[in-house]
């Protein structure tokens, strides 16, 4: 009875994982898998801490993540996100806090260094490349 119970439990867990996440997670890219898992795990009224969630994502997928976060915020989810992504920092209604090693203070999106540097680079990439 012992091995049959263990085998049955493992088969049940495998079936539940397949139902929730799909039969072949390797069929998706790393970023697609990340977004899929995130969508499956987020529950209404949850509090979530995300550390650089943009890391496995292309810019287009970062926009998809932004939409997921916006939709979940409408379901009363709260997010604390450590990010370098100007795209994620642009989430409507986000409170951006700057941690400088000594203090934590609110900062306007347009004043965030990553936003200013990205904007300046996109406005004139040749100027930046000459200074490298």
PLM features: residue spans?
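A short beta-strand-to-loop transition that corresponds to the Sensor-1 phosphate-sensing loop
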Residues: 30, 83-85
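GG-anchored amphipathic helix commonly corresponding to the ABC/SMC/Rad50 NBD signature/C-loop
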Residues: 20, 28-50, 60-72
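Conserved D-loop beta-strand region of ABC ATPase nucleotide-binding domains
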Residues: 51, 81-82
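C-terminal lobe/lid and adjacent interdomain/linker elements of RecA-like ASCE P-loop ATPase modules
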Residues: 60-78, 85-132
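Short loop immediately C-terminal to the Walker-B catalytic DE motif
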Residues: 54-55
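Conserved P-loop NTPase mechanochemical-coupling segment
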Residues: 2-28
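Residue-level preference for the first positions of well-ordered beta-strands
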Residues: 47, 78-80
């Amino acid at each position: 009875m012992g091995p049959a119970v263990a085998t049955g439990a493992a088969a049940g867990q495998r079936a539940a994982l397949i139902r929730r996440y799909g039969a072949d997670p390797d069929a998706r890219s790393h970023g697609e898998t990340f977004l899929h898992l995130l969508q499956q795990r987020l529950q209404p009224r949850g509090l979530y801490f995300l550390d650089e969630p943009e890391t496995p994502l292309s810019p287009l997928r970062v926009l998809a993540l932004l939409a997921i976060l916006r939709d979940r915020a409408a379901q009363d989810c709260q997010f604390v996100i450590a990010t370098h992504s100007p795209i994620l920092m642009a989430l409507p209604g986000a409170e951006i806090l700057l941690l400088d090693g000594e203090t934590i203070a609110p900062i306007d999106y347009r004043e965030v260094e990553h936003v200013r540097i990205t904007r300046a680079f996109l406005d004139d990439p040749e100027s930046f490349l000459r200074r490298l």
